[in-house]
């Protein structure tokens, strides 16, 4: 019986070659599109899921208006994180980051002095590694960024600067500051599925503009992340609505975007 079905199907395909080719091609293209879209969606949904408290972490955005122009930016003024934590019990903690831009770094390895232009530099608050729980291969996440002249490297960066030798305790000199920064920890290389990509971390306290504008609500250069308490995270929409209803700053209203 089944053999006859296949024979009939084959005869129909041969008899109607053009329509058969169109139908089979359409089916193949459709299946390929579904597969590609599924792979894309799965990849997008995998970003930042490895963070322990991913469901409680939100990035603070500014929804504002200048003249007739409406804008939304993913950066805030330096005081925003502390203000949220101090005024809203739903906010357990916060951390901030600042992108300094490319930096010429001088270093010495095996007696040979070299310089490189570093593009993967990120300035962060001292609690950054505890907030996001990036895994370390050397050093202490609780203290490695406490020093104003501390620097943390990824494994890739450590190898670039110091080869196979341990980088802990060694120094990098940032051309802008002319000051040695001591390597205090080494991170595992950042996963591709992380929206936060960097190779070196330094303390925001070492950045002159951050200190200069620490009071400013309209110096929108800091990426601010907040972590809701477990109770608030159980109903994050309600908790965030309470915060949004009560706070409005400078040029616009705070908004949040989840990881």
Q: What kind of feature is each model-predicted range?
A:
Residues 1-15, 19, 51-52, 215, ...:
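Membrane-helix entry/capping segments
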Residues 76-79, 88, 97-103, 109-147, ...:
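The feature marks short, hydrophobic/small-residue-biased sequence motifs that occur predominantly
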Residues 4-8, 39, 75-80, 153-156, ...:
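Short, conserved clusters of charged catalytic residues that mark active-site
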Residues 37-104, 217-231, 235-240, 256:
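Membrane-proximal extracellular/periplasmic loop immediately following the first transmembrane helix
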Residues 124-138, 149-259:
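Mid-to-C-terminal secondary-structure elements
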Residues 9, 28, 40, 80, ...:
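Structural preference for long, well-ordered alpha-helical segments in enzyme cores
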Residues 16-45:
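Short, strongly hydrophobic transmembrane alpha-helices
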């Amino acid at each position: 019986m089944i053999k006859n079905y296949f024979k009939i199907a084959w005869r129909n395909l041969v008899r109607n070659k053009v329509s058969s080719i169109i139908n089979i091609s359409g089916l193949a293209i459709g299946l390929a599109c579904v597969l590609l879209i599924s792979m894309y969606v799965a990849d997008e949904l995998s970003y930042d899921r490895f963070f322990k408290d991913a469901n409680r972490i939100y990035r603070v955005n500014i929804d504002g208006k200048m003249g007739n122009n409406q804008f939304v930016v993913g950066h805030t003024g330096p005081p925003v994180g502390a203000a949220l934590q101090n005024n809203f019990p739903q906010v357990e903690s916060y951390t901030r980051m600042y992108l300094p831009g490319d930096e010429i770094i001088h270093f010495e390895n095996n007696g040979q002095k070299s310089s490189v232009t570093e593009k993967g530099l990120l300035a962060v608050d001292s609690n950054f590694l505890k907030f996001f729980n990036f895994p370390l291969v050397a050093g202490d996440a609780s203290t490695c960024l406490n020093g104003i002249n501390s620097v943390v490297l990824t494994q890739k960066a450590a190898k670039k600067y110091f080869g196979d030798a341990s980088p802990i305790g060694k120094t990098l000199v940032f051309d802008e500051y002319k000051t040695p920064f001591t390597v205090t920890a080494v991170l595992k290389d950042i996963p591709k599925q992380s929206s936060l990509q960097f190779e070196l971390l330094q303390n925001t306290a070492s950045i002159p503009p951050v200190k200069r504008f620490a009071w400013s609500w309209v110096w929108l250069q800091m990426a601010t992340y907040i972590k809701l308490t477990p109770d608030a995270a159980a109903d994050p929409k309600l908790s965030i609505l309470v915060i949004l209803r009560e706070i409005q700053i400078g040029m616009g209203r705070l908004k949040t975007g989840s990881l």
